[in-house]
Each structure stands twice: as structure tokens, then as C-alpha cells.
């Protein structure tokens, strides 16, 4: 059983991980297999996600693969999976920065045009401060997204994971802050399906949750830095 496989309902080929040896939590013993979407024993249930993307739940029952469908060395797939996840997080971080930048621009434009008491609401200093706070969070996320991109090719897996987790923490926190501020500063229109702000926020929320949210990666960062062991 595989859950929330992104684009899993439209893919022609699926890369499936499966344990071929060892215990449930062992690093060794995982293998990757290339499975045809039409293979006997494979069923897919596709659905739309909250951000308008597509995913699927897969059930594999008695699926057979040929020796040539094994990807890489059997039993040694964990480091490969780990690296692909890190590279994916780096890519998602860049996407999140783009979404946050669009949300910030959209919000600033709205503050300049929406009027209350006969003046643009952007003339109120407290709202200007909130727009600046959004920009600060955006730039923090941008810096960490660049860092994640730089470190995605790092040969040392520990150093790479530390950098990726640090980036994911900041991306998640910034995404939530920028998204919430954008919705609140827009008022009711920010929550409508017809307006772009809510869609950006949904996508940012899904990016935060993908491959571990900010809290998960903060714990990972503490483990990689030895902070949890030291505290224990």
C-alpha cells in the first residue's frame, strides 16, 4: 500500500520502494522497482489534493516484476531515496519562495487600491508594518532556499540533510506567516475560490507538509546537531 503518491493516477511508470530484507526500521534492505501502471495486481485510486494537484493511493497485490525492473543495487535503496527527498525539498523550497513572492506582491497591490475611510488602507502605518514583516519572512525563506539548492549536491549526507532540514524549517514558518498575513490583510476576498490568494496559501500549506513539516525537520535538525542526545 502506497499513500498520497503525487501524480500517481496519471503516471505510465511507477517507482516503488519495497523491503527485501531486514527489519521495518533498518536502513539496509530496501529496493526500488520500476512498475508499469497497467501491471496486474496494481490498483490506483486518484483524487485531487487541497492545492489542486493530483495524487493517488496505490495497492499492490501479487505484482510481478522482471529482474531488469530492479533499479540500482537491491537492498541499498535507502540512501538513494534520502537523496531524492532532499533534492525534492530543495526544489519545493524554490517553488514556495515564488508563491510567497507572488502573495506579497498581490497583498501590497491590494493595500494600495482598497480604500477605507476615503483613503487606501495601505496608508495606515500598522498595515505597512505587516507588509514589511511579510517581506522579511519572504527574504529569510529565499536565503534558505538558495542554501538548500547549494547543498543539495553535497556528497556528505549528514551535512546535506542538516542544510535541507534547516531550509525546510524556515520555508515552513515563512510560508505559514506570509500566507496567513496575506489572507487577513485581504479580508473576506482572500478566502474566496475566485481569488488567487487562497490558492497560493493552500499550495504553501501543502509544501510545508510535504516530506515532513517544519516541526519534523526541527527535530531532525536537533538530532543531526546532537542537541537531542546532549539534552538526554
List PLM regions with ranges:
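Helix-biased detector of long, well-ordered alpha-helical tracts
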Residues: 59, 64, 78-85, 91
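Alpha-helical interface subdomain recognition
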Residues: 82-232
Amino acid at each position: 500500500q502506497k499513500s498520497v503518491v503525487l501524480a500517481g493516477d496519471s503516471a505510465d511508470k511507477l517507482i516503488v520502494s519495497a523491503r527485501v530484507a531486514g527489519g521495518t526500521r533498518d536502513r539496509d534492505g530496501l529496493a526500488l522497482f520500476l512498475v508499469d501502471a497497467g501491471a496486474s495486481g496494481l490498483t490506483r485510486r486518484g483524487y485531487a489534493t487541497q492545492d489542486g494537484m493530483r495524487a493517488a493511493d496505490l495497492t499492490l497485490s501479487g505484482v510481478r516484476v522482471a529482474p531488469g525492473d530492479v533499479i540500482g543495487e537491491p537492498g541499498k535503496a535507502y540512501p538513494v531515496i534520502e537523496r531524492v527527498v532532499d533534492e525534492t525539498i530543495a526544489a519545493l523550497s524554490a517553488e514556495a519562495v515564488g508563491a510567497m513572492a507572488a502573495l506579497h506582491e498581490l497583498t501590497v497591490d491590494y493595500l494600495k487600491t482598497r480604500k477605507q475611510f476615503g483613503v487606501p488602507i495601505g496608508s495606515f502605518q500598522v498595515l505597512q508594518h505587516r507588509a514589511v514583516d511579510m517581506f522579511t519572512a519572504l527574504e529569510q525563506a529565499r536565503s534558505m532556499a538558495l542554501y538548500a539548492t547549494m547543498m543539495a549536491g553535497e556528497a556528505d549526507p549528514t551535512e546535506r540533510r542538516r542544510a535541507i532540514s534547516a531550509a525546510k524549517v524556515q520555508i515552513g514558518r515563512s510560508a505559514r506567516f506570509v500566507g496567513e498575513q496575506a489572507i487577513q490583510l485581504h479580508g473576506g476576498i482572500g478566502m474566496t475560490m475566485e481569488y488567487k490568494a487562497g490558492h497560493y496559501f493552500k499550495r504553501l500549506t501543502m509544501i510545508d507538509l510535504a516530506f515532513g513539516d517544519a516541526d519534523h525537520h526541527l527535530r531532525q535538525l536537533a538530532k543531526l546537531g546532537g542537541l537531542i542526545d546532549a539534552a538526554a
